Amino acid sequence: MFNPHALDSPAVIFDNGSGLCKAGLSGEFGPRHIVSSIVGHLKFQAPSAGANQKKYFVGEEALYKLEALQLHSPIERGLITGWDDMERLWKHLFEWELGVKPSDQPLLATEPSLNPRENREKMAEVMFENFGVPAFYLSDQAVLALYASACVTGLVVDSGDGVTCTVPIFEGYSLPHAVTKLHVAGRDITELLTQLLLASGHTFSCELDKGLVDDIKKKLCYVALEPEKELSRRPEEVLREYKLPDGNIISLGDPLCQAPEALFAPQQLGCQSPGLSHMVSSSITKCDADIQKILFGEIVLSGGTTLFHGLDDRLLKELEQLASKDTPIKITAPPDRWFSTWIGASIVTSLSSFKQMWVTAADFKEFGSSVVQRRCF
């Protein structure tokens, strides 16, 4: 039975990403809990295992026990592909991270641009039928990131762990015909950096696992303004030091700018899609001529993979060459952009006017899962 008073409670927010899921409550400044989007299942069930033995592990606990587990990523390239594991991850967030009963509070979940219809309806079914939420809403990650910058019209460049996309938004609505996606993002840059480091001739005193290379990437990688010039600089000009977990210090050079270069030149990963600057230009030129100038003047970066030092300057430089002469271009790079989407969700669910937006359990019962197609856009 739908309880209308549940809409007065702070909403639960799940920002579902390929690499991280961020969970928290409406009205707060940031997510309370951030977990890796990983579910691990035991490779072998001990014969003496009792009924209480855990069958699966989520997030960091799964990564910690990875030797004994088979790891699964329920979100691939931004899209949910493993629904059973996704449900386990959400259950973990509700019960163990937030400590809330799903039936007590409304839930806003984020979704990627161009999320397929079947995925949207499946999520509504899982939330209403399996978790018993009183109300639910699905919101575009790029639109929420734009809200976090106090804008309703602009172009969002969103790059996380699994996918990079450019999303034009007009008065709070994304323009799907002009969305551009690239399957090169954080995890691809980490893999490329690993290959480059191994090929560089360095000897590493400890294993180059994903966690270590991720840390090197986040602390030292950068985007060069002029990549050819950067590679011709003297080694001592580009070398940066990194302290390994065993205390040894190594000096790293060219790979630090070569790996993020894949965002601007995906061809180096065998991907024939255009790079970031051309994606932005292409998305904007697919929009109505009347709003193209506005979009060039309000480009907002979102997602952890846009945090590379120099990325905004390089994007601006290349867009100035691609845009028509005298087009004003402004790129906003919020410092907290790795969770901009979550902040936007916290803002919109705090508005009193949002109460009428919720798809309630009664709506779901009356109209079925297709109700999200009409109500969440």
Curated annotation (Swiss-Prot):
Coiled coil: none annotated. Signal peptide: none annotated. It holds the Pfam family Actin. Its main location: cytoplasm. GO terms for cellular component: cytoplasm; cytoskeleton. Keywords: Cytoplasm, Cytoskeleton. SUPFAM superfamilies: Actin-like ATPase domain (SSF53067). InterPro entries: Actin, Actin/actin-like_CS, ATPase_NBD. Gene3D superfamilies: 3.30.420.40, Actin, Chain A, domain 4 (3.90.640.10). The keyword Cytoplasm applies. It is found in: Cytoplasm, Cytoskeleton. It comes from the Eukaryota. SMART domains: ACTIN. Belongs to the actin family. PANTHER family: ACTIN. This is Actin-related protein T2. It comes from Macaca fascicularis.
